[in-house]
């Protein structure tokens, strides 16, 4: 897997300053962008085993989030710094607080919480995610079945949904651009960020989980990933949850 870049997804122009005669003062009213995604992680174990892993997120979340920076907030929260993103000469380095609620009969929810001693500089984030553990019979492909390895009888699909909204207080010089241009660009960048983070985080969590289950299970996961190329991991949808 390639490391998560901390460079902007879009190449930004040099940041204007007042010395250039451009109004760089920030507006008070945020412009809101939103995106909605669904996806799935496949775990080659029963739901009980998968749930035990997710319940013990303190042991893997920070490690799997790397190279993003993650710091604990209490027992079930994390302050996550995503990286630098931007366009039109304006960049932000989002830091969000995420609360991983304890499971409720195989359902996990993640929501936004404040980051202690931190005020977001010109942006707001509303993050709502739901993960559901679904245990199903394992039906291997012909290639996996012919491998001769011992295969599990059950597997768990971790089906997730994300509703993400971000409000940004732009400088005045950006607000002079057509509203439709700002909206379209912002929505697109937000979707790119979600795809980038989700694809890499999903792989690392799956790899970490299957490593914990032994060499044979890790080998099975990697073969399956090569066959599927990560299909279904992350897909943008509409409307909102």
Give each language-model segment a name.
Residues 2-21, 210-241:
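Charge-rich (especially acidic), low-complexity segments
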Residues 2-91, 97-99:
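Hydrophobic ligand-binding cavity/cleft-lining segments
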Residues 39-47, 84-88, 94, 100-106, ...:
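Beta-strand elements of well-folded, non-transmembrane domains
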Residues 57, 112-114:
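Acidic, aromatic-enriched beta-alpha/helix-loop junctions
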Residues 62-68, 98, 124-135, 157-166, ...:
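Domain-wide signal for the mature, well-folded portions of proteins, strongly enriched
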Residues 70-76, 101-105, 150-154:
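Short, ordered beta-strand-loop transition motifs
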Residues 120-187:
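Beta-strand/loop substructures that line and gate deep hydrophobic ligand-binding cavities in soluble
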Residues 177-230:
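A conserved amphipathic terminal alpha-helix motif
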């Amino acid at each position: 897997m390639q490391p998560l870049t901390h460079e902007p997804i879009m190449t930004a122009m040099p940041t204007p300053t007042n010395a250039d005669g451009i109004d760089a003062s920030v507006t008070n009213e945020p412009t809101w962008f939103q995106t909605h995604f669904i996806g799935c992680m496949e775990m080659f174990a029963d739901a009980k085993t998968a749930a035990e892993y997710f319940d013990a997120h303190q042991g893997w979340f920070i490690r799997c989030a790397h190279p993003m920076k993650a710091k604990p907030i209490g027992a079930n929260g994390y302050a996550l710094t995503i990286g630098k993103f931007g366009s039109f000469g304006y960049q932000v380095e989002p830091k969000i607080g995420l609360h991983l609620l304890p499971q409720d009969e195989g359902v996990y929810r993640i929501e936004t919480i404040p980051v202690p001693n931190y005020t977001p500089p010109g942006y707001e984030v509303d993050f709502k995610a739901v993960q559901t553990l679904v245990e199903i019979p394992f039906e291997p492909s012909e290639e996996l079945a012919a491998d001769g390895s011992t295969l599990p009888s059950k597997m768990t699909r971790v089906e997730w949904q994300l509703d993400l909204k971000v409000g940004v207080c732009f400088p005045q010089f950006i607000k002079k651009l057509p509203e439709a241009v700002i909206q379209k660009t912002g929505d697109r960048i937000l979707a790119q960020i979600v795809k980038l983070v989700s694809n890499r985080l999903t792989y690392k969590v799956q790899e970490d989980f299957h490593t914990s289950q032994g060499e044979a299970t890790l080998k099975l996961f990697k073969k399956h990933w090569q066959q599927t190329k990560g299909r279904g991991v992350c897909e943008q949808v509409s409307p909102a949850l």
